[in-house]
């Protein structure tokens, strides 16, 4: 599925240590039907895709420093109501944090 046309800037800001950034950039492939997310890194962007539908729900762009740490410099959330029923930007940011913490065991460095 393509990146959604209807999206909103999230203003998501995070700093990841080098080891954590590497984990995130390696992505995540669902292992079972219970896994609801597919996460991949492409052209400096991390994309969060619903594994069952293929819809892109969130994305954020990383600026990677020479030491390997990474800053989120742009972010968005899908606002196509046929693809994602958003509650709020705050809820979207919490969902991203929960996914990063749960899937990659990553804690932000900010």
Where are the predicted features?
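A short, structured loop/turn motif at beta-sheet edges
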Residues: 41-44, 64-70
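Polybasic, proline/glycine-rich intrinsically disordered low-complexity segments
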Residues: 69-110
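Negatively charged, low-complexity tracts enriched in Asp/Glu with abundant Ser/Thr
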Residues: 1-45, 83
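A broad structural signal for short, well-ordered beta-strand segments within beta-sheet-rich domains
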Residues: 5, 57, 67-74
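Canonical SH2 domain fold
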Residues: 46-64
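A generic structural signal for short, solvent-exposed coil/turn residues
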Residues: 31, 40, 52-54, 67
